[in-house]
């Protein structure tokens, strides 16, 4: 195969991967789900950063957190473009976004940890994109299945799923399938200033962030 044909085949494959969305939903499922409040908080967990260091989530005490499982080659990837303006408009710096790359949905995050930031900067969303100082991108992890990260196990236990159907089996790169699973890239959990998960949002429940902003404002007003 010539070099040109090889490049073309890779481009076509990438386009097919990016085109894959999670399960389609009706408008009745776009309302966020409220989470069960318990004594356990996200501060009980730590996660690996891109450089391999472990970070305790206690560093985010008294912050409102938007926790997102992200992927570079997903139809929802352009939501990255909305994160910086939302954080930039948060004048008191209370809001932080924690991005957790995951490759479990149709292999849409194939990069290694050291490649992720360059992929975001030069490929998708590209155009020199870099994260706001209050957006923290962690190392790759698994959000579902046998090896789901303890943080995500906790979030799924506390917050009901946003839709009754998870998706097509061939698009889900993990086992076993659970009823509370994260359904696709860019699902979001909103955490209050005490570290308690409060709301869970479907990836399509976004609209440049306007669908989530009222709930962020609600938690920021709380003492």
Swiss-Prot record:
Pfam families: GSHPx. It is an enzyme of class 1 (oxidoreductase). One of its GO terms (biological process) is response to oxidative stress. The keyword Ribonucleoprotein does not apply. The keyword Secreted applies. GO terms for cellular component: extracellular region. Glycans are attached at residues 39, 92. GO terms for molecular function: glutathione peroxidase activity. InterPro entries: Glutathione_peroxidase (IPR000889), GPX_AS (IPR029759), GPX_CS (IPR029760), Thioredoxin-like_sf (IPR036249). Residues 1-19 form the signal peptide. Its EC number is 1.11.1.9. Keywords: Glycoprotein, Oxidoreductase, Peroxidase, Secreted, Signal. It catalyses: 2 glutathione + H2O2 = glutathione disulfide + 2 H2O. It is found in: Secreted. The active site is at 74. Homotetramer. Could inhibit the oxidative burst of leukocytes and neutralize the secondary products of lipid peroxidation, thus providing the resistance of these parasites to immune effector mechanisms and their persistence in the mammalian host. It may also be involved in the formation of cross-linking residues such as dityrosine, trityrosine and isotrityrosine identified in cuticular collagen. Highly cross-linked external cortex may also serve to protect the parasite from immune attack. Belongs to the glutathione peroxidase family. This is Cuticular glutathione peroxidase.
């Amino acid at each position: 195969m010539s070099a040109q044909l090889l490049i073309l085949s890779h481009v076509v494959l990438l386009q097919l991967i990016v085109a894959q969305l999670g399960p389609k939903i009706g408008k009745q499922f776009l309302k966020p789900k409220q989470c069960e409040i318990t004594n356990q908080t996200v501060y009980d967990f730590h996660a690996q950063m891109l450089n391999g260091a472990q970070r305790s989530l206690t560093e985010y005490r008294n912050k409102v957190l938007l926790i997102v499982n992200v992927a570079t080659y997903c139809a929802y990837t352009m939501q990255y473009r909305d994160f910086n303006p939302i954080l930039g408009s948060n004048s008191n710096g209370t809001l932080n976004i924690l991005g957790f790359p995951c490759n479990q949905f149709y292999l849409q995050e194939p990069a290694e940890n050291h490649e992720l930031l360059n992929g975001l900067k030069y490929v998708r969303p590209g155009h020199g994109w870099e994260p706001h100082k209050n957006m923290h991108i962690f190392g790759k992890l698994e959000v579902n299945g046998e090896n789901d990260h303890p943080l995500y196990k906790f979030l799924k236990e506390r917050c009901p799923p946003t839709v009754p159907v998870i998706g097509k089996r061939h698009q889900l790169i993990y086992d076993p399938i659970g009823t509370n699973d994260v359904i696709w890239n860019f699902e979001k959990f909103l955490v209050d200033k005490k570290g308690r998960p409060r709301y869970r949002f479907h990836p399509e429940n976004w609209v440049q962030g306007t669908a989530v902003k009222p709930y962020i404002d609600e938690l920021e007003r709380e003492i």
